[in-house]
Structures are given as C-alpha cells and as structure tokens.
Amino acid sequence: MPRTRAVVHTFHVAALGVWLGSLLMTGVAAAILFPTMKGLDPKLPAFAEYTGDHWMIAAGRAADRIFSINDALQLACALVVVVTLAAGAVWCNLRPTGLRGVLRLLALCVALVALGFQLFVLAPRMSLNLRTYWQAAQAGDRPLADRHQAAFSTDHTTAQNTLATITLAVGVLLLLSVWPQGLAAPTPPTTPPTPRPAGDSPLEPPALLKGLR
C-alpha cells in the first residue's frame, strides 16, 4: 500500500507540474511571438487583397496552434489530477483533510470551473470568430474581417483573465500537494549530567551524622 500511495501521489504531482508548465510556457510563447512578428511586419501573399495588418494574421496562425496544444494538455492533465485524487482518497487513504484539504479542493474546483469555461464556452466562440476573420481577410473583405477581429479581441481579454485564474489555482494546488504536512517541534538540547565526585552519595545524610560533622 505505501508503494501504491507513492505512485498515485507522484502521478498527481506530475500532472499538476505539466499543467502549470504548459500554461506558463504558452503565455511566454505568446508574449514573444506577437511583438516579434509585429517587428518583422511580414506581407502574406495569400492575403494580398487584405489591407490590414498581416503580422497579426501570421502571429495568430502560429499562436492558434500553440493554444490548441495547450488546451489538449490542460484537459489531459486535469483528468489525471482528478483521477489520482479520487484514487488516492478511495484506495490509499489520501483524503484531503483540515484547512489544507479544504484549500486543495477549493483550488481544484476553481481550476476545473475556469478550464471548463475556457474549453467549452470561450474557445469555440473565439475559434469561430478567428477563422471567419481569416477567411474574410483572405477574400479582401475588410469590414467583415474587422468585425470578427473585434469580436475575437473582446473575448481575448476574458480568455487572458481565465488562463491567469487557472494558472494561479493550479500553482496553489501544486504547492499544497508537495508542501510537507508539518514540521516536527525542535527537540531541546540535552545537557549531560554533571559527574559527582567520587565518594559522594546522592542520598541525604541522616540527621545524626549531620550533628556529628
């Protein structure tokens, strides 16, 4: 059973680590990609009739792949986290208890609710607006492209806040999962007993002997 507990806990922590790492690296990639592409200011032959910013389309195409991979990783990691938490509670007596357990469950619920909102509400709507924007831009329909780009940008702020919430919740959950249960109270230093002189008795001498001394 101790080995099973260790395996379950290891998978739980590993899934949280991959989940958090995926979120952080996705944010870093986006923060690097868009300014770099803006500085390059490419002109895309496939969008020759579009008079808007081509760098935004080029960066968006690359970022869309990155965020799609991140979404898949998040979903897989969330499933592993939930399964290992349930398996640990049922078979390995790894039930979250006390304030620490309440905080872990709260962080997990926040992460799962935010992830569900991201995957099943925001992502489909943003994907539809993004692809319509690209199609309109490729056809040279600037008004339609601008309209869907604006709709995408409106959701983009919400998506950023949602991903930040997931990152914070997963980070807290990971910290609580690996933090030691508690620190033992320090043991006071023991002073070795003072040796008694030879011939000294630890017993109180009788009163009669005291009077004779």
Regions found by a protein language model. Name each.
Residues 165-172, 179-183:
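A hydrophobic membrane-anchoring alpha-helix module
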Residues 191, 208-213:
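Short, charged juxtamembrane terminal tails flanking transmembrane helices
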Residues 81-106, 177-203:
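Cytoplasmic juxtamembrane regions at transmembrane-helix boundaries
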Residues 66, 146-167:
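Individual transmembrane alpha-helices with interfacial aromatic-anchor signatures
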Residues 120-129:
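Hydrophobic alpha-helical transmembrane segments in integral membrane proteins
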Residues 2-13, 17-95, 128-149:
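Interfacial loop at the N-terminal end of multi-pass membrane proteins
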Residues 3-21, 101-111, 170-176:
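Alpha-helical transmembrane segments and their helix-start/interface "positive-inside/aromatic belt" motifs
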